[in-house]
């Protein structure tokens, strides 16, 4: 196994920069390419933003020892949450419903319903959650999100269980 570097600050800051680039690309697709995000896409953006914020705080803090594991655990939980949304959307894209329904937007659902009612509606997905509007190398945005959340989860596991350089 590759040993963790003594100074993990550049690693955390690189994760922050990568998440910022992913979010910037999503905003580019939305504002300049006209691809409107569905509720699941927006939740994935929130998860990437949270991974980025956790990494930024860790990079500025420069933790050692148990602190690295705390940040690694937070990154793992956030990456798994975002990855589960991306996996659900990928599944919906592979097996779309017979007649997709266009549900309300995320903002409307969160304003009009309590969170306990809105979350199941979001995960049922709207008709546009199963649409594939953009691909790169044969993979949709949801597929790429799933891969990126998987990479973040692997990095978090490395932070949690990797050997330390003495």
From Swiss-Prot:
GO terms for biological process: protein folding. Residues 29-46, 88-143 are periplasmic. It is found in: Cell inner membrane. Disulfide bonds join 38-41, 102-129. Residues 1-11, 64-70, 163-166 are cytoplasmic. The keyword Cell membrane applies. Its main location: membrane. GO terms for molecular function: electron transfer activity; protein-disulfide reductase activity. The keyword Iron does not apply. Keywords: Cell inner membrane, Cell membrane, Chaperone, Disulfide bond, Electron transport, Membrane, Oxidoreductase, Redox-active center, Transmembrane, Transmembrane helix, Transport. SUPFAM superfamilies: DsbB-like. This is Disulfide bond formation protein B.
